[in-house]
């Protein structure tokens, strides 16, 4: 059981650190949107690259924030029955859901995106706009990174659920839980 706890803590720590860093990018995105509005409407200067950078950050925040959201149980669920379940029953639902749905979907996204991302890298795909950002291939790489990070956190959730189902008191197993505010 000790190796499982070590793996679980490593994944949880990685997800927590990356999630908190990514959360700060929303502030950068707000600043860039204000900059786009000010330069466009007050200075009458438009910047395609600046507008695209907002889109890039938006993609980065949403795609790379999925694992952090999963860790903090922030994904939408229909919990008509779930909320009344015991912790062990909830863990069983999470374990089965993780194994039957989360893992296969992450693998499907990764493998169906693989050729698409490689093709973009092969040509160093750039923006269709003349003054756009020349890094579309990097943006598309998020399509591979997202399922990897989500799968890693899914594995952590499966481990936690498995421990609960097997009767282990996870609060006494030195699992890292960080509930501090991001800001």
Regions found by a protein language model. Give the residues of each.
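Alpha-helical transmembrane segments and membrane-interface helix-loop junctions
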Residues: 1-183
């Amino acid at each position: 059981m000790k190796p499982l706890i070590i793996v679980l803590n490593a994944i949880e720590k990685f997800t927590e650190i990356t999630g908190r860093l990514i959360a700060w990018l929303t502030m950068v995105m707000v600043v860039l949107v204000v900059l786009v509005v000010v330069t466009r409407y007050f200075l009458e200067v438009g910047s395609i690259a600046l507008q695209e950078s907002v889109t890039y950050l938006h993609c980065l925040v949403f795609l790379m924030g999925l694992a952090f959201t999963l860790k903090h149980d922030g994904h939408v669920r229909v919990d008509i029955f779930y909320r009344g379940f015991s912790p062990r029953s909830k863990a069983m639902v999470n374990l089965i859901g993780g194994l039957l749905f989360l893992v296969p979907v992450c693998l499907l996204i990764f493998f169906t995106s693989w050729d698409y991302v490689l093709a973009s890298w092969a040509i160093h795909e750039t923006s269709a706009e003349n003054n756009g950002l020349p890094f579309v291939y990097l943006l598309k790489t998020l399509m591979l990174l997202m399922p990897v990070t989500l799968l890693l956190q899914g594995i952590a959730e499966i481990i936690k659920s498995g421990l609960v189902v097997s009767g282990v008191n996870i609060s006494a197993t030195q699992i890292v839980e960080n509930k501090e505010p991001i800001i």
